[in-house]
Amino acid sequence: MKTFEKVLEIFRGYLDCDREEEVLKCSQGYLRVTWNGTSRFCVDGILSRTPDELFEMLLSDYSSCELIQRTKGRREVTEEDEKQAELLCQSFREQWEEEES
């Protein structure tokens, strides 16, 4: 069964490493908050009302983070960078799809 808890379990390693991302439980679902370094203001906060919404958001965030790490923010993203990031994302998708069965 797909649950918010399973999404958090799948992305635990990523969330532990990315100090600017935080996921908070709230009355409407889960809120993904992005911080900007040590600023007391967040960059954004996006509500996910379903586990699928949270999964897709975190997968996108993970992919973006992976591309930044690959380029170190100093060069354009190449096709190979995108291919490697997609391969890593595929393992998350496979774990998520296992929850349907």
Regions from the PLM with identified roles:
Residues 1-2, 94-101:
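Short intrinsically disordered terminal tails
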Residues 25-92:
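Acidic, low-complexity, intrinsically disordered interaction modules
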Residues 1-21:
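Negatively charged, low-complexity tracts enriched in Asp/Glu with abundant Ser/Thr
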Residues 23-24, 97:
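Compositionally biased, intrinsically disordered low-complexity segments enriched
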Residues 10, 14, 57, 95:
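Residues that form generic nucleotide/phosphate-binding pockets
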